Amino acid sequence: EIMINGTDHIFLEKAGRIFESDRRFVSVAKLEDVIQQIAAGANRYVNEASPIVDARLEDGSRVNVVLRPVALNGPIMTIRKFPKEAVTMKQLIDWGSISQEAVNFLKILVESKYNIFVSGGTGSGKTTFLNALSDYIPKDERIITIEDNAELQIKGVSNLVRLEARNANLEGEGAVTIRDLIKSALRMRPDRIIVGEVRGDETVDMISSAMLNGHSGSMSTGHANNPMDMLHRLETMMLMGIELPLIAIQQQIASALDVIIHLGRLRDKSRKVLEITEVLGYENGRIQLQTLYKFQEEGMEDGKIKGTLMKENEITQREKLLAAGYSETGIHGGSVQRNSDHGDDGLSVL
C-alpha cells in the first residue's frame, strides 16, 4: 500500500509494516499532475468540484484520491497494489493466519453451498481471504462476481462473469450500482453470486434475493468488529433499502446466512482468522449464534503473536452437508465423510 499525504509525506506498507519513504514530490502542482494522469488513465475525473474518486488501474491496483478543499493539507492519494498471483489458502496456513483443520472444514462448507460472510476491520484481509476461499467452489459452476472495484482473482472457473460498479459521470448520470448489478446477476442464471463487499442498501438484494432465492453458496464481506456486530450492521444496511419491521429483517438474515468468518489484524500487524461462527436461526427475539472455532492467544515469540484456532463446537445445521453427499454417520462420528457414490471418501473435518 502506498499512502501519499501531500508532497512531503509518503508512507509504504509492506509485510504488515508501515514506514516513511525518503521520496518527495517537488511541488503540489507536480503531485496534482500525477493524480490527473492516473485518474484520466482510469477514465475518472477529479477536481475541486468533485474532489473524491476511486479507481482501478490496468494492473488491478486500487486508487483513492482526495483533493482540496476536502483534503486540508493538500492532495491525498492511496494506492493499494495486489500481488500478480492471488494468495492461496496454503499460503495463509503457512503464514499462521488459519489452521489446516479449519481450512478443511471451510472447504467442505463451500462445496456444500453454505452461505458465507467474511467480516473484519479495515486491512484485516477480507478480500484476500474471500478470494482464497472461492478456490474451493466446484469448477463446473456458473459464478458471478460483483464489486465496487474489481479485486477478486478467481482462477480455474471458465463460466465466470465479472461485474464492476460504475460511478456517475460529471452530469450525475450513468451510475451503475452494486444493487443494479445484483438485480441483473439474478437474471443470468448464476449458481453462486459473490459480492466483494456490502456497504449499503444493496444488502437487501444480497440477502433477500440472492441468498434466500435459490443461490446457495453465495459469499460476501463486510466491515465489523465481531460476528454479532456484523449482524447488527447488516440489519442497519437492510433498513436503508427496505421498509420492514426489524424482526422481519432479522429473520431474513438468520435464514440467509449460514456461517460468519471473522478476521482481525492483531497488534503485531499479523492477520488471522479470529472466529468461525454458525448462524443458528432466529429465536427469543434475536439471531442465535454458535462459535465453531475461536483463536486463543498463547503469548509472544520473536515479536509475533502465537496462538491456536481452537475448535469449540460441532456445526449444528447439517442439511446442506447431507444434500452434498456427506454421511450423517461421518458427521456425528467426528469427521465428515462423503458417500462413496459422490467420491472424496474420508474427508476429515469435524
What is each residue range found by the language model?
Residues 4, 9-112:
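P-loop NTP-binding catalytic core
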Residues 115:
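Walker A (P-loop) ATP-phosphate-binding motif of ABC ATPase nucleotide-binding domains
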